[in-house]
Amino acid sequence: MSSTALYTVPTAGPDDVAALKALDGHSASDILAVIGKTEGNGCVNDFSRTLSAAVWHPLLEDSAITVFSGGAEGVISPHVNIFVRDERQYSGHPRGLVTAVGRTRVIGPEEIGRPAQVDAVHETVVALLTELGVGPDDVHLVLIKCPLLSSDAIAGVHRRGLRPVTTDTYESMSRSRAASALGIAMALKECDRDRALLALEGRDDVWSARASASSGAELDDCHILVVAESDAAANPLRAAHTAMRDALDIQALTEVFDRIAAEGGTVRQIFAKAEADPSGAIRGYRHTMLTDSDVNATRHARAAVGGLIAALHGNGAVYVSGGAEHQGPSGGGSVTVIYDVPATANATGEASR
């Protein structure tokens, strides 16, 4: 179990590691996870993610993970969120935020987007909950970086006489996110395996407000971060989660922000998923995110939701990731808010729902 501190630091580019100097006395050996937004396109050929991973990994312990989400469209500002191990006991805080990180086994290209990936994610998340000593109800965020299918990987699957889940590299990002999110839902007991596999086939509606998955070409396993609250920790950090029902759902956000304010809390960071409503309309009005041949729909969605969340937060260094398959209701997205409370405030995490 790792009691946690969080530092959100702007970056000057994908290769910027200056955040190591902004950890309030913590060192690189204390880092559990680096979760960043980079200014690439967020698509298959976004090498800003690869660059960030390449410069950060040699600086971290082998047990630490990185998750870099490409796409800083609109007002989203590139940054890193660094979760560090903080075993200090803060008086006046009967509980606090805890995190655990891990990796699945290597996901074979023929397994991406399929039940094997769902199962691998489920098994790893369950193991991380056990490590933390928490139950599913204590968890506010499970954030995953998962692999995609490159052209070479697809060709290799065919050479072995197998079939990939898709031959479209961009679609493989969606399929991988979907399988990862359903593995999370299983681990948090939001569905059983039968329902998860039906949802994977598009025959059931399963989603989690605590799942956040993004995919990339820079890894062949899944990097996983679990964020929960625990009575075994004593720090000022808390978390709350909700789901936006669509890209305009400011009410879902303000309700959480208001409850945090009622606790005397201060918002530290927002982790959100966003997608273009697959129906082609939002609240009865047609949108063109899915029919724009110049800009991918995930980029439109990040810009729209990123602007909404940044306006509420007061700055653009917010973690908004595109593609919300099974991560919130269709057309919406999961949201987790991490905040801190003063020692004299109600520290029971009542903002959560």
From Swiss-Prot:
Site feature Important for substrate specificity, where: T298
Catalytic activity annotation: cyanurate + H2O = 1-carboxybiuret + H(+)
Activity regulation summary: Inhibited by barbituric acid.
InterPro entries per UniProt: AtzD/Barbiturase, AtzD/Barbiturase_RUA, AtzD/Barbiturase_RUB, AtzD/Barbiturase_RUC
UniProt entry keywords in alphabetical sequence: Hydrolase, Magnesium, Metal-binding, Plasmid
Active site residues according to the UniProt entry: K145, S214 (nucleophile)
Highest taxon listed in the record's lineage: Bacteria
Classification via Pfam families: Amido_AtzD_TrzD
RU C: annotated segments: 237-353
Amino-acid positions noted as binding substrate in the UniProt annotation, renumbered to this chain: R49, S69, G70, R177, S214, S215, R302, S321, G322
UniProt-annotated stretches for the region RU B: 96-231
The protein's annotated pathway: Xenobiotic degradation; atrazine degradation; biuret from cyanurate: step 1/1
EC numbers for this chain: 3.5.2.15
GO biological process: atrazine catabolic process
Gene Ontology molecular functions: cyanuric acid amidohydrolase activity; metal ion binding
Annotated segments matching region RU A: 1-90
Binding annotation for Mg(2+): E275, A324, Q327, G328, P329, G332
Stated role: Responsible for the hydrolysis of cyanuric acid, an intermediate formed during catabolism of s-triazine based compounds in herbicides such as atrazine and polymers such as melamine. Catalyzes the hydrolytic opening of the s-triazine ring of cyanuric acid (2,4,6-trihydroxy-s-triazine) to yield carbon dioxide and carboxybiuret, which spontaneously decarboxylates to biuret. Required for growth on melamine or cyanuric acid as sole nitrogen source.
Assigned protein family: Belongs to the cyclic amide hydrolase (CyAH) family.
Swiss-Prot/TrEMBL domain comment: The monomer structure is formed from three repeating units (RUs) that share the same structure as one another. The monomer, the active site and substrate all possess threefold rotational symmetry, to the extent that the active site possesses three potential Ser-Lys catalytic dyads. It is possible that any or all of the three active-site serines may act as nucleophile (albeit only one can do so per catalytic cycle).
Oligomeric form and interacting partners: Homotetramer.
Stated name of the protein: Cyanuric acid amidohydrolase
Originating species: Rhodococcus sp
Lineage: Bacteria, Bacillati, Actinomycetota, Actinomycetes, Mycobacteriales
